[in-house]
């Protein structure tokens, strides 16, 4: 078995998990493996599992997949068949019993929240993160009916006009990070009092205008997945390919932002 670290720009995909309609990261990965002649059983490589399922528009730096891979399959070889927006960059040989989903002890997400001062208060945002950290039933922060009890930590730092929010837990329910960030943003902007978070963490469901909608997916990144005892070896050529591809995309988006800023008619 071999585990691979995968980075991808999720903006052009309908999520990570394979589906029959619409391009997903997993679809692209399986097509690449098929082109390379990797064996499949029941539509996937033997032993295949992934660390998590990111939603449409969400990106990743450390998505992790593992399966029975031939000895010659290095990240650089995988990149030769993957689209440019998906880059393998490290790998680790793991035991036959390794499972990329179940063996992960922690997952870390990072959200880049556009929240310039003074419209968003950093002190209020930090207080909101502290209130949401710990062990809670987050049933009001996810559409899931089960698996809503989680223990997590939230931290943030200001980076210019952005609040960078880091969320870490053993696992996350659907939309949990994005709804947590939306709640933090509402407190930071003065749209909700800090006491609202206590209500959101109570047993009673929130309804109507009190409901918490998910923040947009595009600013969210799966930053890390932790596997104790597993040491990933960076493929230098593959990592350089990833840096080049994503640096180019960054420059293009900076240019796109300048164009968007110039669209308003003159006053």
UniProtKB/Swiss-Prot annotation:
Instruction: Report which reactions are catalysed by this protein.
Output: uridine(38/39/40) in tRNA = pseudouridine(38/39/40) in tRNA
Q: What does this protein do?
A: Formation of pseudouridine at positions 38, 39 and 40 in the anticodon stem and loop of transfer RNAs.
InterPro entries from the entry? Answer: PsdUridine_synth_cat_dom_sf, PsdUridine_synth_TruA, PsdUridine_synth_TruA_a/b_dom, PsdUridine_synth_TruA_C, TruA/RsuA/RluB/E/F_N
List the SUPFAM superfamilies hit by this protein, alphabetically. Answer: Pseudouridine synthase
Question: What EC number(s) has UniProt assigned to this enzyme?
Answer: 5.4.99.12
In the UniProt record, the signal sequence range is none
Q: Does the keyword Ion transport feature in the UniProt annotation?
A: no
Spell out the family assignment given in the record's similarity comment.
Belongs to the tRNA pseudouridine synthase TruA family.
- UniProt keyword list: Isomerase, tRNA processing
GO annotations under biological process? tRNA pseudouridine synthesis
Q: Where is the active site?
A: 55
Binding residues for substrate: 109
MF terms per GO, please? RNA binding; tRNA pseudouridine(38-40) synthase activity
Q: What is this protein called?
A: tRNA pseudouridine synthase A
Q: Which domain of life is it from?
A: Archaea
Which residues, by range, are in coiled-coil regions? none
